[in-house]
């Protein structure tokens, strides 16, 4: 039987940060993962360049039933702390937009940095390792694994959520939480594209690959970024962002011309260019194909002088407030994150330790904390992993 001080299950972003930090303060750490490679989500993130944090991280960028839970960890390990580690290792990076930091080269720069840090402090990493059972001891935990039996003082669950099962995502962390008496908040896919099945499907298919700067709103939340038309429906950063606030049956409102006061713009065009066709004017804002499709699908395109005031108002309403009721989302298959999870009211916000079972910790995406798109979920992984490592 193997004995150690800390066992961390899950060698993703949160697990790696927790391991290197705990071992760095002298703890004997065993890091286990059922996959054949550590940090798979790190490697595929940001189109292979890893959007590893956001310069503007603050608690307001996170969704949780307990809005205050993330504050302590985010304050104690900030984006600047992680940027400092990146700089120490000489990993070149840049800001893409909106505070989003990406590697100049490839995501593996971040993974190699974390693995090097783990090596330097003696973390024992074992991949292709499954956990059969976990049992609470008088002091600590007993794990039955494919490595054999392992005992530990502290057990950290860093197994992530259900998003992107092809990378090995499972509900293991939720099973452990349930086993030790924790409530789970309902889970669903977040930061995920919408599917469309009504008459809009044909429009989306025709425009597949077209990207447009929009203001997208739902349930009192709004995001100004691009939307992307796809064969299945709608995607792009603004759609992924709003998907975390959308519930089945909700209407999503899309302003296709956020830089314009659309009614005034149309009236101005009617006054100044009365002989120009609507599709010609829209072609100066959108691609010609999109302008033609919108004009053909939504309006009867004719010279501006032929529209009545009522028709102009209806066109403005459609362009500035296009209402879409998605059929659903693409689900966990393509979702970047999982909403819901372990109820944070049953976990210490200071230590990440279970309030139900001493010595058990939960970090990262397995908890009911979900960041906006743009590096925030990685920052939660770093911060929650660091917080737990101070006490595990």
Go through each PLM region and give its residues.
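A glycine-rich dinucleotide-binding beta-alpha-beta segment and adjacent secondary-structure elements
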Residues: 127, 292-370
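Feature captures the FAD/FMN-dependent oxidoreductase FAD-binding
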Residues: 76-154
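N-terminal Rossmann-like FAD-binding beta1-loop-alpha1 element of flavoenzymes
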Residues: 4-31, 388-392
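Glycine-rich FAD pyrophosphate-binding loop
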Residues: 23-47
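An anion/pyrophosphate-binding glycine-rich loop and adjacent beta-alpha core
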Residues: 36-38, 43-44, 52-59, 92, ...
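Short hydrophobic core segments
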Residues: 7-9, 32, 131, 150-166, ...
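Glycine-rich active-site loop/strand segments that organize a redox cofactor
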Residues: 49-95
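A conserved FAD-binding loop/helix module that cradles the flavin
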Residues: 163-176, 180, 369-392
């Amino acid at each position: 039987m193997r004995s150690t001080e800390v066992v961390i299950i899950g060698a993703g972003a949160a697990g790696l940060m927790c391991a290197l930090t705990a071992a760095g303060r002298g703890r004997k750490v065993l890091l286990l993962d059922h996959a054949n490679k550590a940090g798979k989500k790190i490697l595929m993130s940001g189109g292979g360049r890893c959007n590893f944090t956001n310069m503007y991280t603050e608690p307001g960028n996170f969704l949780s039933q307990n809005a205050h839970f993330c504050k302590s960890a985010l304050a104690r390990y900030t984006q600047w702390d992680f940027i400092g580690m990146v700089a120490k290792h000489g990993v070149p990076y840049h800001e893409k937009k909106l505070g989003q930091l990406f590697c100049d080269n490839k995501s593996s720069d971040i993974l190699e940095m974390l693995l090097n840090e783990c090596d330097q402090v003696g973390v024992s990493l074992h991949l292709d390792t499954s956990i059969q059972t976990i049992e609470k001891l008088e002091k600590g935990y007993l794990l039955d694994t494919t490595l054999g039996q392992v005992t530990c003082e502290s057990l950290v669950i860093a197994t992530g959520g259900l998003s992107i099962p092809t990378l090995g995502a499972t509900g293991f962390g939720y099973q452990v939480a349930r086993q030790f008496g924790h409530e789970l908040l309902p889970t669903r896919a977040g930061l995920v594209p919408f599917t469309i099945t009504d008459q809009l499907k044909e429009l989306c298919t025709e425009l597949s690959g077209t990207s447009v700067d929009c203001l997208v709103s739902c349930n009192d939340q709004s995001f100004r970024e691009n939307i992307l038309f796809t064969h299945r429906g709608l995607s792009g950063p603004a759609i992924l962002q709003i998907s975390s606030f959308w519930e089945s049956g909700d209407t999503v409102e899309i302003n296709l011309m956020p830089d314009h006061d659309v009614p005034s713009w149309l009236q101005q065009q009617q006054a100044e260019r009365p002989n120009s066709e609507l599709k010609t004017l829209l072609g100066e804002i959108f691609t010609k194909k999109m302008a033609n499709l919108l004009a053909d699908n939504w309006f009867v395109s004719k010279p501006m002088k032929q529209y009545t005031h009522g028709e102009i108002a209806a066109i403005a309403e459609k362009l500035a407030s296009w209402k879409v009721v998605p059929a659903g989302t693409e689900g966990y298959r393509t979702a970047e994150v999982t909403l819901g999870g372990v109820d944070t009211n049953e976990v210490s916000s200071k230590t990440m330790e279970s309030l139900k079972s001493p010595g058990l910790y939960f970090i990262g995406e397995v908890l009911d904390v979900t960041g906006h798109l743009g590096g925030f979920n990685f920052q939660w992984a770093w911060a929650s992993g660091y917080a737990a490592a101070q006490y595990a």
